[in-house]
Protein backbone atom coordinates (compact mmCIF):
# COMPACT_ATOMS: atom_id res chain seq x y z
CA UNK A 1 0.00 0.00 0.00
CA UNK A 2 3.05 2.26 0.04
CA UNK A 3 6.42 2.61 -1.70
CA UNK A 4 9.26 4.97 -0.79
CA UNK A 5 12.32 5.24 -3.01
CA UNK A 6 15.83 5.79 -1.69
CA UNK A 7 19.18 5.99 -3.45
CA UNK A 8 19.97 2.29 -3.05
CA UNK A 9 16.77 0.64 -1.84
CA UNK A 10 12.99 0.75 -1.59
CA UNK A 11 10.77 0.71 1.47
CA UNK A 12 7.47 -1.04 0.86
CA UNK A 13 4.51 -0.93 3.22
CA UNK A 14 2.54 -4.16 3.17
CA UNK A 15 -0.93 -4.64 4.63
CA UNK A 16 -2.28 -8.02 5.65
CA UNK A 17 -4.66 -9.66 8.13
CA UNK A 18 -2.27 -8.85 10.98
CA UNK A 19 -1.87 -5.18 10.08
CA UNK A 20 0.87 -3.27 8.29
CA UNK A 21 4.60 -3.86 8.14
CA UNK A 22 7.54 -2.34 6.28
CA UNK A 23 10.09 -4.30 4.26
CA UNK A 24 13.13 -3.15 2.31
CA UNK A 25 14.37 -4.28 -1.11
CA UNK A 26 17.08 -3.27 -3.55
CA UNK A 27 14.60 -3.28 -6.45
CA UNK A 28 10.86 -3.47 -7.10
CA UNK A 29 9.44 -5.72 -9.82
CA UNK A 30 5.99 -4.40 -10.60
CA UNK A 31 4.22 -7.42 -12.10
CA UNK A 32 0.79 -6.48 -10.80
CA UNK A 33 -1.11 -7.24 -13.99
CA UNK A 34 -4.16 -5.03 -14.26
CA UNK A 35 -2.96 -3.03 -11.26
CA UNK A 36 0.50 -2.20 -12.64
CA UNK A 37 -0.37 1.48 -13.08
CA UNK A 38 -1.61 1.69 -9.48
CA UNK A 39 1.72 0.33 -8.21
CA UNK A 40 3.57 2.82 -10.40
CA UNK A 41 1.42 5.51 -8.83
CA UNK A 42 2.72 4.47 -5.40
CA UNK A 43 6.29 4.55 -6.69
CA UNK A 44 5.83 7.93 -8.36
CA UNK A 45 3.20 9.84 -6.33
CA UNK A 46 1.45 12.65 -8.12
CA UNK A 47 2.02 11.26 -11.62
CA UNK A 48 -0.79 9.93 -13.80
CA UNK A 49 -0.08 6.52 -15.27
CA UNK A 50 -1.73 5.52 -18.54
CA UNK A 51 0.31 2.61 -19.80
CA UNK A 52 -2.33 -0.11 -19.84
CA UNK A 53 -5.22 -1.04 -22.03
CA UNK A 54 -7.55 -3.48 -20.32
CA UNK A 55 -9.28 -6.02 -22.54
CA UNK A 56 -11.72 -8.54 -21.09
CA UNK A 57 -11.63 -12.13 -22.28
CA UNK A 58 -14.45 -14.52 -21.37
CA UNK A 59 -15.08 -18.24 -21.80
CA UNK A 60 -18.13 -20.47 -21.56
CA UNK A 61 -18.25 -24.11 -20.47
CA UNK A 62 -20.90 -26.44 -21.86
CA UNK A 63 -21.43 -30.21 -21.57
CA UNK A 64 -19.30 -32.24 -23.96
CA UNK A 65 -20.32 -31.06 -27.42
CA UNK A 66 -18.24 -33.20 -29.77
CA UNK A 67 -16.81 -36.71 -29.83
CA UNK A 68 -13.11 -37.44 -29.61
CA UNK A 69 -10.23 -35.80 -27.79
CA UNK A 70 -9.83 -33.10 -30.41
CA UNK A 71 -9.62 -29.34 -30.04
CA UNK A 72 -11.03 -27.16 -32.79
CA UNK A 73 -10.27 -23.65 -33.98
CA UNK A 74 -13.00 -21.66 -35.72
CA UNK A 75 -12.83 -18.55 -37.87
CA UNK A 76 -15.58 -16.30 -36.56
CA UNK A 77 -17.53 -13.95 -38.79
CA UNK A 78 -15.79 -10.89 -37.34
CA UNK A 79 -12.37 -12.28 -38.22
CA UNK A 80 -11.50 -13.44 -34.71
CA UNK A 81 -10.39 -16.97 -33.92
CA UNK A 82 -12.44 -19.07 -31.51
CA UNK A 83 -11.65 -22.45 -30.01
CA UNK A 84 -13.50 -25.43 -28.54
CA UNK A 85 -11.42 -27.66 -26.27
CA UNK A 86 -12.27 -30.90 -24.43
CA UNK A 87 -12.36 -29.90 -20.78
CA UNK A 88 -12.26 -31.54 -17.37
CA UNK A 89 -11.64 -35.18 -18.35
CA UNK A 90 -13.59 -34.66 -21.56
CA UNK A 91 -16.89 -34.25 -19.73
CA UNK A 92 -17.21 -30.64 -20.85
CA UNK A 93 -16.24 -28.37 -23.74
CA UNK A 94 -14.51 -25.02 -23.16
CA UNK A 95 -15.31 -22.33 -25.73
CA UNK A 96 -13.56 -18.99 -25.99
CA UNK A 97 -12.77 -16.25 -26.16
CA UNK A 98 -13.89 -12.62 -26.39
CA UNK A 99 -12.04 -9.30 -26.72
CA UNK A 100 -13.96 -6.51 -25.03
CA UNK A 101 -12.50 -3.15 -23.90
CA UNK A 102 -12.84 -2.95 -20.12
CA UNK A 103 -12.97 0.05 -17.81
CA UNK A 104 -15.05 -1.24 -14.89
CA UNK A 105 -14.00 -2.65 -11.51
CA UNK A 106 -11.04 -5.01 -11.97
CA UNK A 107 -12.03 -6.86 -8.80
CA UNK A 108 -15.42 -7.83 -10.24
CA UNK A 109 -14.86 -9.13 -13.75
CA UNK A 110 -17.79 -11.13 -15.11
CA UNK A 111 -18.99 -12.31 -18.50
CA UNK A 112 -21.84 -10.30 -20.02
CA UNK A 113 -24.95 -11.72 -21.66
CA UNK A 114 -23.74 -10.27 -24.95
CA UNK A 115 -20.49 -12.23 -24.65
CA UNK A 116 -22.36 -15.45 -23.90
CA UNK A 117 -24.56 -14.91 -26.95
CA UNK A 118 -21.49 -14.10 -29.08
CA UNK A 119 -19.67 -17.30 -28.11
CA UNK A 120 -22.76 -19.48 -28.51
CA UNK A 121 -23.51 -18.06 -31.95
CA UNK A 122 -19.91 -18.29 -33.14
CA UNK A 123 -19.50 -21.94 -32.14
CA UNK A 124 -22.95 -22.87 -33.45
CA UNK A 125 -21.84 -21.91 -36.95
CA UNK A 126 -19.62 -25.02 -36.92
CA UNK A 127 -21.50 -27.56 -34.79
CA UNK A 128 -24.41 -29.65 -36.03
CA UNK A 129 -26.20 -28.92 -32.76
CA UNK A 130 -26.61 -25.27 -31.93
CA UNK A 131 -25.37 -24.03 -28.56
CA UNK A 132 -27.68 -21.72 -26.61
CA UNK A 133 -27.14 -19.74 -23.40
CA UNK A 134 -29.26 -22.37 -21.62
CA UNK A 135 -26.53 -24.95 -22.35
CA UNK A 136 -23.86 -22.96 -20.50
CA UNK A 137 -23.01 -24.58 -17.15
CA UNK A 138 -20.20 -22.22 -16.12
CA UNK A 139 -18.25 -19.19 -17.28
CA UNK A 140 -15.08 -17.38 -16.36
CA UNK A 141 -13.55 -14.08 -17.33
CA UNK A 142 -10.29 -12.24 -16.94
CA UNK A 143 -8.81 -8.90 -17.86
CA UNK A 144 -5.75 -8.82 -20.09
CA UNK A 145 -3.42 -6.02 -18.93
CA UNK A 146 -2.09 -5.15 -22.39
CA UNK A 147 0.43 -2.47 -23.19
CA UNK A 148 -1.41 0.43 -24.79
CA UNK A 149 -0.06 0.72 -28.32
CA UNK A 150 -3.09 2.84 -29.32
CA UNK A 151 -4.51 0.22 -31.72
CA UNK A 152 -8.07 1.12 -32.69
CA UNK A 153 -9.41 -2.45 -32.33
CA UNK A 154 -9.12 -4.31 -29.02
CA UNK A 155 -8.28 -7.53 -30.90
CA UNK A 156 -5.33 -5.80 -32.55
CA UNK A 157 -3.64 -4.57 -29.35
CA UNK A 158 -0.23 -6.19 -29.01
CA UNK A 159 -0.07 -9.31 -26.84
CA UNK A 160 3.72 -9.02 -26.57
CA UNK A 161 5.10 -8.00 -23.21
CA UNK A 162 6.86 -4.69 -22.62
CA UNK A 163 9.36 -4.11 -19.79
CA UNK A 164 10.12 -0.67 -18.43
CA UNK A 165 12.97 -0.24 -15.96
CA UNK A 166 13.11 3.16 -14.28
CA UNK A 167 16.13 4.16 -12.18
CA UNK A 168 15.29 7.85 -12.02
CA UNK A 169 16.09 9.15 -8.58
CA UNK A 170 17.50 5.99 -7.06
CA UNK A 171 16.72 2.29 -6.77
CA UNK A 172 15.13 0.62 -9.82
CA UNK A 173 11.50 -0.25 -10.41
CA UNK A 174 10.86 -2.69 -13.26
CA UNK A 175 7.30 -2.70 -14.58
CA UNK A 176 5.82 -5.50 -16.69
CA UNK A 177 3.09 -4.70 -19.22
CA UNK A 178 1.20 -7.31 -21.20
CA UNK A 179 2.47 -10.79 -21.94
CA UNK A 180 0.84 -14.21 -22.12
CA UNK A 181 1.16 -17.42 -20.16
CA UNK A 182 2.95 -18.94 -23.17
CA UNK A 183 5.86 -16.51 -22.70
CA UNK A 184 5.95 -16.24 -18.90
CA UNK A 185 9.31 -18.00 -18.49
CA UNK A 186 11.04 -15.94 -21.15
CA UNK A 187 9.50 -12.79 -19.68
CA UNK A 188 10.85 -13.64 -16.22
CA UNK A 189 14.37 -14.25 -17.52
CA UNK A 190 14.22 -11.03 -19.51
CA UNK A 191 13.17 -9.15 -16.37
CA UNK A 192 16.11 -10.55 -14.41
CA UNK A 193 18.46 -9.62 -17.23
CA UNK A 194 17.21 -6.04 -17.04
CA UNK A 195 18.02 -6.00 -13.32
CA UNK A 196 21.41 -7.65 -13.77
CA UNK A 197 23.41 -4.40 -13.34
CA UNK A 198 21.77 -3.90 -9.95
CA UNK A 199 22.58 -7.43 -8.76
CA UNK A 200 26.18 -8.21 -9.76
CA UNK A 201 26.05 -11.59 -8.01
CA UNK A 202 23.08 -12.80 -10.06
CA UNK A 203 23.53 -16.29 -11.54
CA UNK A 204 23.12 -17.12 -15.22
CA UNK A 205 19.69 -18.06 -16.63
CA UNK A 206 18.69 -21.63 -15.75
CA UNK A 207 14.94 -22.02 -16.25
CA UNK A 208 14.95 -23.14 -19.90
CA UNK A 209 15.70 -26.75 -19.00
CA UNK A 210 14.09 -26.79 -15.54
CA UNK A 211 10.84 -28.61 -14.78
CA UNK A 212 7.91 -26.94 -13.13
CA UNK A 213 7.05 -28.26 -9.64
CA UNK A 214 5.83 -31.82 -10.11
CA UNK A 215 6.79 -31.81 -13.77
CA UNK A 216 9.98 -33.85 -13.45
CA UNK A 217 8.32 -37.00 -14.81
CA UNK A 218 10.99 -39.45 -16.04
CA UNK A 219 11.26 -39.27 -19.81
CA UNK A 220 8.18 -37.01 -19.84
CA UNK A 221 6.20 -40.26 -20.25
CA UNK A 222 2.98 -39.62 -18.36
CA UNK A 223 1.39 -43.01 -19.01
CA UNK A 224 4.48 -44.82 -17.74
CA UNK A 225 4.50 -42.54 -14.70
CA UNK A 226 0.84 -43.37 -14.09
CA UNK A 227 1.55 -47.09 -14.30
CA UNK A 228 4.23 -46.68 -11.64
CA UNK A 229 1.79 -44.82 -9.41
CA UNK A 230 -0.76 -47.59 -9.85
CA UNK A 231 1.78 -50.15 -8.68
CA UNK A 232 2.62 -48.07 -5.60
CA UNK A 233 -1.03 -47.33 -4.81
CA UNK A 234 -3.01 -50.36 -6.06
CA UNK A 235 -5.92 -49.47 -3.76
CA UNK A 236 -6.71 -46.25 -5.61
CA UNK A 237 -9.48 -45.97 -8.17
CA UNK A 238 -7.84 -45.32 -11.54
CA UNK A 239 -9.97 -42.33 -12.48
CA UNK A 240 -9.03 -40.52 -9.27
CA UNK A 241 -5.37 -41.48 -9.54
CA UNK A 242 -5.19 -40.16 -13.12
CA UNK A 243 -6.72 -36.83 -12.10
CA UNK A 244 -4.32 -36.41 -9.21
CA UNK A 245 -1.35 -37.38 -11.38
CA UNK A 246 -2.33 -34.84 -14.03
CA UNK A 247 -2.83 -32.12 -11.43
CA UNK A 248 0.21 -32.69 -9.20
CA UNK A 249 2.69 -34.76 -11.20
CA UNK A 250 5.51 -36.15 -9.09
CA UNK A 251 4.17 -34.31 -6.05
CA UNK A 252 1.21 -36.67 -5.87
CA UNK A 253 3.10 -38.97 -3.49
CA UNK A 254 3.49 -36.10 -1.03
CA UNK A 255 -0.26 -35.50 -1.25
CA UNK A 256 -1.14 -39.17 -0.68
CA UNK A 257 1.39 -39.57 2.11
CA UNK A 258 1.15 -42.92 3.88
CA UNK A 259 -2.49 -43.57 2.96
CA UNK A 260 -3.26 -47.21 2.20
CA UNK A 261 -6.95 -46.87 1.44
CA UNK A 262 -9.46 -44.32 0.23
CA UNK A 263 -10.77 -44.06 3.80
CA UNK A 264 -7.34 -42.84 4.90
CA UNK A 265 -7.61 -39.91 2.45
CA UNK A 266 -10.18 -38.48 4.85
CA UNK A 267 -13.54 -36.94 4.21
CA UNK A 268 -14.91 -37.15 0.66
CA UNK A 269 -16.36 -33.75 -0.23
CA UNK A 270 -17.68 -35.02 -3.57
CA UNK A 271 -16.32 -35.18 -7.09
CA UNK A 272 -13.29 -37.16 -5.91
CA UNK A 273 -12.07 -34.34 -3.66
CA UNK A 274 -10.83 -35.71 -0.36
CA UNK A 275 -9.59 -34.13 2.84
CA UNK A 276 -5.98 -35.10 2.05
CA UNK A 277 -6.03 -33.05 -1.16
CA UNK A 278 -7.68 -30.07 0.51
CA UNK A 279 -5.11 -30.14 3.31
CA UNK A 280 -2.28 -30.32 0.77
CA UNK A 281 -3.64 -27.30 -1.10
CA UNK A 282 -3.92 -25.31 2.11
CA UNK A 283 -0.40 -26.15 3.26
CA UNK A 284 1.47 -25.97 -0.03
CA UNK A 285 -0.58 -23.88 -2.48
CA UNK A 286 -1.97 -21.13 -0.23
CA UNK A 287 -5.63 -22.16 -0.63
CA UNK A 288 -7.91 -20.60 1.98
CA UNK A 289 -11.44 -20.73 0.59
CA UNK A 290 -13.71 -23.11 -1.29
CA UNK A 291 -13.37 -20.91 -4.36
CA UNK A 292 -9.58 -21.19 -4.13
CA UNK A 293 -9.82 -24.98 -4.22
CA UNK A 294 -12.77 -25.55 -6.54
CA UNK A 295 -12.02 -22.89 -9.13
CA UNK A 296 -8.51 -21.43 -8.80
CA UNK A 297 -6.49 -24.57 -7.97
CA UNK A 298 -8.79 -26.89 -9.90
CA UNK A 299 -12.06 -26.86 -11.79
CA UNK A 300 -13.73 -29.34 -9.45
CA UNK A 301 -16.64 -26.98 -8.94
CA UNK A 302 -18.01 -28.47 -12.13
CA UNK A 303 -18.25 -31.84 -10.38
CA UNK A 304 -19.67 -30.86 -6.97
CA UNK A 305 -23.27 -30.08 -6.14
CA UNK A 306 -24.17 -26.81 -4.43
CA UNK A 307 -24.66 -28.61 -1.11
CA UNK A 308 -21.25 -30.29 -1.44
CA UNK A 309 -19.64 -26.92 -2.17
CA UNK A 310 -21.32 -25.44 0.89
CA UNK A 311 -20.09 -28.32 3.07
CA UNK A 312 -16.53 -27.75 1.88
CA UNK A 313 -16.79 -24.02 2.59
CA UNK A 314 -18.02 -24.67 6.13
CA UNK A 315 -15.24 -27.19 6.78
CA UNK A 316 -12.60 -24.75 5.49
CA UNK A 317 -13.88 -21.90 7.64
CA UNK A 318 -13.47 -24.10 10.70
CA UNK A 319 -9.94 -25.10 9.69
CA UNK A 320 -8.80 -21.54 8.95
CA UNK A 321 -10.24 -20.15 12.18
CA UNK A 322 -8.94 -23.02 14.34
Where are these regions (language model features)?
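A conserved short coil-to-beta-strand element within the FAD-binding core of flavoproteins
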Residues: 1-11
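Glycine-centered loop/turn positions within well-structured domains
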Residues: 10, 21, 37, 93
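Short beta-strand segments that buttress and anchor functional surface loops
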Residues: 12-16
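Core beta-strand elements of the Rossmann-like FAD/NAD(P) dinucleotide-binding domain
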Residues: 18-27
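Glycine-rich, N-terminal phosphate-binding loop of Rossmann-like dinucleotide-binding domains
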Residues: 32-33
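Short, well-ordered alpha-helical microsegments
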Residues: 36-37, 184
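C-terminal catalytic lobe of FAD-dependent flavoproteins
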Residues: 43-95, 100-320
Amino acid sequence: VGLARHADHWEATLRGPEGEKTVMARAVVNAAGGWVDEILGLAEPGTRQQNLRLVKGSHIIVPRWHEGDYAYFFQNGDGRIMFAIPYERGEFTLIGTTDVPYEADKDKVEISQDEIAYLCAGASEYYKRSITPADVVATYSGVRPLYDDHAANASKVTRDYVLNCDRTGGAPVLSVFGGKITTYRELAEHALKELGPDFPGMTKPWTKSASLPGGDIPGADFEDFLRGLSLRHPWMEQRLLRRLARAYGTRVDALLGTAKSTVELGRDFGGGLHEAEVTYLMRHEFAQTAEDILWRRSKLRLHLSESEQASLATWLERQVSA
